[in-house]
C-alpha cells in the first residue's frame, strides 16, 4: 500500500478529509473546465487529488511538505500523466507546474496552521496584490477563519482581514464541514469557501490601497474604541470631524461597524484632501 504505516502528524496539522459529499461539493465549486490547471496544497493521501484527476482539468499540481506522503503520492498516481508533485513548503517553493505554466485555480484542504501566510501568498496584500490572480480558490478552512473572511460589518467576527479580503475578492460559503468529516477529527469545525479574486482592473489603485491598509492597521489595533479615538493620530479633530461629516460617517462608530466600501471612501477622502501621507 502507498501509505502503509503512515499516521497523521500533528506538527503538520494533518487531518485527512474522508467525507465524499464534501469532496463532491468542493469539485462542484471549482467548476473545473478542460483547460484548467489546478494547484492543490497539502494533498495528504490523495483523496481530493483523485477527484481532481478524475475531472476534465488539463493538469493537477500538488505541493506536499511531508516526505513520506510525497513518496506515497508518487506511488499512488504514478500512471497519471497530468499529475505533478512538488516536495517542499508551499510558502516558499515555486507554485508553477512542472512545465513552467501557472495554475489558474486553487483547490485545497489547507493546513490550518499556515492559513494567514498562505492566503497572502495566493492573493497578495491589499496594497500589493499578486500580479496574475487565480480565477478562483476553493479552500477548506477552519470555520472561525472562514467566518472572519466573509463577515458583514457589525458582526463580532468582522475584522481587518474581512475588509482586506473583501476588497481583493468575492468570498462566499460553499458548505460547512464537521469534525467527523476528517480522520483524525480536528477539535474545530471547518468550512469550504469560494474566493474569486477581482480582476486587476477592478482593484483599488495603489495609493488608495496603501491608504486603506494604513487606516486598517491604525483603527483595528483598538477595535473596541470609537473611531474618534482610533483615528485621532491620523489627523486633527476638526479636520477629522469635517471629513466624517462629508462622508456621512459617525465617529462614535467602532472600526468593525464600517463596511469595506466605507473604508475606501474614508481613504479616498484623505487622499483628496492630502491631509496625511500613508505609512510606507
Curated annotation (Swiss-Prot):
Gene3D superfamilies in the cross-refs: Ribosomal RNA adenine dimethylase-like, domain 2, Vaccinia Virus protein VP39
Its primary localisation, in coarse terms, equals cytoplasm
**EC main group:** transferase
- Name of a matching Pfam family: RrnaAD
- Tell me the compartments it is located in: Cytoplasm
Q: Which SUPFAM superfamilies match?
A: S-adenosyl-L-methionine-dependent methyltransferases
Q: What is this protein called?
A: Ribosomal RNA small subunit methyltransferase A
Gene name per UniProt: rsmA
Amino acid at each position: 500500500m502507498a501509505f502503509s504505516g503512515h499516521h497523521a502528524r500533528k506538527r503538520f496539522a494533518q487531518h485527512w478529509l474522508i467525507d465524499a459529499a464534501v469532496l463532491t461539493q468542493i469539485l462542484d465549486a471549482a467548476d473545473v473546465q478542460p483547460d484548467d490547471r489546478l494547484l492543490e496544497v497539502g494533498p495528504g493521501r490523495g483523496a481530493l487529488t483523485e477527484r481532481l484527476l478524475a475531472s476534465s482539468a488539463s493538469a493537477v499540481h500538488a505541493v506536499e511538505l511531508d516526505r513520506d506522503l510525497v513518496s506515497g503520492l508518487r506511488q499512488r498516481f504514478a500512471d497519471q500523466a497530468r499529475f505533478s508533485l512538488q516536495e517542499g513548503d508551499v510558502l516558499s517553493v515555486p507554485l508553477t507546474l512542472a512545465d513552467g505554466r501557472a495554475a489558474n485555480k486553487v483547490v485545497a484542504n489547507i493546513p490550518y496552521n499556515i492559513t494567514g501566510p498562505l492566503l497572502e501568498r495566493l492573493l497578495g496584500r491589499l496594497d500589493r496584490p499578486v500580479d496574475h490572480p487565480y480565477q478562483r480558490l476553493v479552500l477548506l478552512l477552519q470555520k472561525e477563519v472562514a467566518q472572519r473572511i466573509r463577515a458583514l460589518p457589525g458582526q463580532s467576527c468582522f475584522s481587518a482581514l474581512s475588509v482586506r479580503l473583501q476588497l481583493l475578492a468575492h468570498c462566499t460559503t460553499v458548505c460547512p464541514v464537521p469534525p467527523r468529516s476528517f480522520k483524525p477529527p480536528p477539535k474545530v469545525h471547518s468550512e469550504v469557501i469560494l474566493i474569486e479574486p477581482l480582476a486587476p482592473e477592478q482593484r483599488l489603485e495603489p495609493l488608495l490601497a496603501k491608504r486603506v491598509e494604513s487606516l486598517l492597521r491604525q483603527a483595528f489595533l483598538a477595535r473596541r474604541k470609537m473611531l474618534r479615538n482610533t483615528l485621532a493620530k491620523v489627523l486633527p479633530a476638526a479636520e477629522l470631524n469635517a471629513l466624517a461629516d462629508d462622508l456621512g460617517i459617525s465617529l462614535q462608530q467602532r472600526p468593525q461597524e464600517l463596511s469595506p466600501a466605507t473604508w475606501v471612501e474614508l481613504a479616498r477622502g484623505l487622499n483628496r484632501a492630502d491631509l496625511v501621507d500613508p505609512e510606507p
